[in-house]
Amino acid sequence: MSDIIKLKHVRKEYDDGFVALKDINLTIESGKFYSLLGPSGSGKTTILRIIAGFSEPTSGQVFFDGQDITNLDAAKRKINTVFQNYALFPHMNVFENVAFGLQIKKKDKQEIKLAVKEALHMVQLDGFANREISELSGGQQQRVAIARAIVNQPKVLLLDESLSALDKRLRKDMQFELREIQKKLGITFIFVTHDQEEALAMSDEIFVLNEGKIQQSGSPVDIYDEPVNDFVARFIGDSNILSGRMIKDYEVEFGNHRFECADAGIKPGEKVEVVLRPEDLDITDIEHGKLRVVVESQLFLGDHFEIKAIDSDENEWLIHSTNPTKIGKEVGVYFDPEDIHVMRFGESEAEFDKRLEAYEGEE
């Protein structure tokens, strides 16, 4: 796939001295679904606004299809945006809202009619053309906003927290619908969210941001299974994170025990952090466990039990299990070497990738 958007050394500093973006470099390929994921204030919406042309970077460049568009007016970019509040016109019906952009461009009436019909069909709103906006549910308004954006046939569609106003069930339904729409259209979607589940469910690739910097980028599986630092490990899903020490390649120490692991390329004796996901931990009898813990609490969450336990060194453990246990019981905890992920302190994403390639190449 060809590159459609590139940001090179983009920095955004406001008049009050606040730096929203710090040397952002990213590449967006054509035809993929991307998520910009991070907490409030991480810089994700600022990146979206700079791509859209609603905000100019203090320094750096923005490229679209190989052309420098850093100073190009937003209206001249082949990019459309779906805003958090949908920004629909309440005095217009569904057809008029979707047709608005085409009418501004003075397109032929019959061409507009056919384009609007096709866009509404794409978002499963056949027969809604004459409905008033006030008659629509939140999910239907979301679809109208998407139809209004895609009717202009943009090369890139930007979505700014566009599912956040929906209830949980509808939000999940719209995740599937957005992904299907993106696949049918074959255009690039860039989705801004603070919701990890949304990003993991929909994206081909994710950029994880914090404090104006890209912490890690990659596929949902790579980011979940191989977080590059403490922030990513804690922000993407639940984690057990413990202090440890690398013994040698493929062996790490934590909790006063040594364990076989799948990591290498770290100096013997180097202090590290160890990540174990709750769903990778199995409760077993003490004899077969690699660790001993005492169960402190247990919650039933529908598809699993969330169990909190503590070991003899006062380390707290979070375990997701499909089977219940008993509070106060001492149990064994089992995990495979591949379930252990070792993180170096201060290691950048580039350094992590280089180390990963080196030791995977030796296998």
Curated annotation (Swiss-Prot):
Keyword presence, Transport: yes
Subcellular location: Cell membrane
All residue ranges annotated as the ABC transporter domain in the record: 5-236
Main location: membrane
Residues binding ATP: 38-45
Molecular function as annotated in GO: ABC-type putrescine transporter activity; ATP binding; ATP hydrolysis activity
Topology relative to the membrane: Peripheral membrane protein
CDD domains xrefs: ABC_PotA_N
Organism: Lactobacillus johnsonii (strain CNCM I-12250 / La1 / NCC 533)
Assembly, per entry: The complex is composed of two ATP-binding proteins (PotA), two transmembrane proteins (PotB and PotC) and a solute-binding protein (PotD).
Gene Ontology cellular-component annotations: ATP-binding cassette (ABC) transporter complex
This enzyme's EC code(s): 7.6.2.11
Protein name, UniProt field: Spermidine/putrescine import ATP-binding protein PotA
